[in-house]
Amino acid sequence: GTWEQYEAAGEWLDKLAAGIGCEIHRVQMVPGNHDLDRDKLSVGGSKLLEYIREGGAAEYEEVIANENDRSTLFSRFEDYGRFSVGYNCGLDDEAKYATNLRIEVGPGRWIRFVRLNSALLCHGREREEPAELMIGARQFTIPRPVAGEEIVVLVHHPLHWYKDAQEVRQYVDSRVRVFISGHEHDPKVQVNKFDDNCDVMMLAAGAAVPFKSDDTYTYTYNIIEFDWDESSDSLSVAIHPRTWNPAKTSFEADNKRLGGSEPQFILGSPNFRKAGLAAVDSGPKPSADTPDHVPEHVEFVPTEDAEVDTEETATMPSDVEGYELALLRFFRDLFESDRLRILLALDAIPAESNERMNQGMERKLFDWLVREGRLPEIIEMTDRLIAERNEGEM
């Protein structure tokens, strides 16, 4: 996970977003075992990982509770951190779960994305059996959903890779509607009934680039649709798996994996029902092809955690037009020197300040400028600095 690779990833994501009609900043991401820079693992960091592997939950919390030890492990995610914060998917630097986005799928019916980092303990030789990775209580205490809201968890490693899988599973079964993981290269889906009116989908999404290609492991990707099933007041999940056909040298529908020929699932969703009857528009529903198509309703929401400082929560900017794209370009497309140049020019950094500058501090200052109404100036300076760099490269 080096910056040159993330630059290429950003270009690929921009092309992917354009191909499916998605805004380039409307991306959710979580880190995997290839997203950390293993060359940055120090001798001390190796000892910390070994200490946790040989121990358990108590040893994990002992290390993570220490700011210096935590920083040692997170230092390997420096480039990923800069990349992901541009997409508003930055890592929680206290190793907690991250959640700041929810999307309306029906009248008063929402899905909230919760992101987990399962790669913090990765070192390049991690094993599935016996499991040695951990999610940790700071992350697996997933927020209890509110009425009208179902939770979709995004994480890289499947459950059985964790030493604390049993504890994680308790929270998944009681609070999550869809659990999406990657890492393993053979896609699978399973729906478990928690009770008569409550389902939990475990979706192992597979990998676009497997370590080998044969009848079992091949190049795959999925298109997943989330919708509201009005008749049952439930979350509807339609999975459209795609697989590589080497004979045709193209991707095609995959009728063997992830639901086969009937990839639509209606999941019992008690949190939808808690919201009461939905106010349904009885008129004809516009299609995506009609001019009056209504865009999706997306909300940025603060992490719901009793331990979050109210002052910290207040740093979230209001829904300012252009904020998301400006955030992406500021962190992903500018050098660190350019970002500091903007912050200094706009008086975001006090002249007498000697506080250490990191991505978290840069993000706070960026959001402060937005709240002060200075987003247009950020955008103008970002455009100018990128243009100057491009001219210099010609």
Residue ranges and their predicted role:
Residues 118-184, 189-194:
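Active-site-proximal segments of metal-dependent phosphoesterases and phosphodiesterases across multiple
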Residues 1, 26-34, 114, 152-156, ...:
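Extended hydrophobic secondary-structure segments that form protein cores and membrane-embedded regions
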Residues 60-148:
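Binuclear metal-dependent hydrolase catalytic cores centered on His/Asp/Glu-rich metal-binding motifs
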Residues 9-17, 137-139, 224-226:
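Short, well-ordered amphipathic alpha-helices
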Residues 226-372, 376-380:
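A short C-terminal boundary segment appended to hydrolase-like catalytic domains
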Residues 1-68:
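Core catalytic region of metal-dependent phosphoesterases/phosphodiesterases
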Residues 9, 32, 116, 153, ...:
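Divalent metal-coordination and catalytic microenvironments
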Residues 159-237:
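Conserved beta-sheet core of the metallophosphoesterase superfamily
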